[in-house]
UniProtKB/Swiss-Prot annotation:
Function: Fluoride-specific ion channel. Important for reducing fluoride concentration in the cell, thus reducing its toxicity.
Protein name as annotated: Fluoride-specific ion channel FluC
Catalytic activity, as annotated: fluoride(in) = fluoride(out)
A Gene Ontology BP annotation from the UniProt entry: cellular detoxification of fluoride
Transmembrane segments annotated in the record for this chain: 3-23, 34-54, 66-86, 100-120
Alphabetic keyword roster: Cell membrane, Ion channel, Ion transport, Membrane, Metal-binding, Sodium, Transmembrane, Transmembrane helix, Transport
Binding locations of Na(+): 74, 77
Tagged with keyword Transmembrane: yes
NCBIfam families named among the record's database cross-references: crcB (TIGR00494)
GO cellular component labels: plasma membrane
Keyword Glycosyltransferase: no
Family to which the UniProt record says this protein belongs: Belongs to the fluoride channel Fluc/FEX (TC 1.A.43) family.
Gene that encodes the chain: fluC
Record text on activity regulation: Na(+) is not transported, but it plays an essential structural role and its presence is essential for fluoride channel function.
Length: 124
């Protein structure tokens, strides 16, 4: 059941991301990734909101949490996960780990894009 919940949430989240990105490009143009920026900010807000609510005020089942957080928000943006994990490190007092996590995530992520692009360019 959990796999189905994640799949349903991911399908919804990915379609929301696509729709929002198309809308933003039509509204403001495609020269800047407005859609991705909007998705990442909304997703970061949503994961913080949902997970704090789920642990303080609501009683979500594991399946519901997986559908919303792992599926929907994971399909919408993985940036929200990075943001919430950074929040968790900071609020637990692990400032150095949070800084290292953010810098390494962005640094290695960007390096991965360049590496992947480089490998793709040299393929026959």
């Amino acid at each position: 059941m959990n796999i189905i919940a994640i799949a349903v949430g991911a399908a919804i989240g990915a379609n929301l991301r696509y729709s929002l990105s198309i809308w933003a490009a039509q509204r403001w143009g495609a020269s800047f990734p407005y859609g991705t920026l909007i998705v990442n900010v909304i997703g970061s807000f949503a994961i913080g909101f949902v997970l704090v609510l789920a642990t303080t005020r609501l009683s979500l089942s594991d399946t519901a949490r997986l559908l919303i957080v792992t599926g929907l928000l994971g399909g919408f943006t993985t940036f929200s996960s990075l943001s919430f994990e950074t929040y968790t490190l900071v609020t637990s007092g692990s400032w150095m780990a949070a800084g290292l996590y953010v810098l390494s995530s962005f640094g290695l992520g960007i390096a991965g894009v360049f590496l992947g692009a480089g490998v793709a360019r040299v393929l026959p």
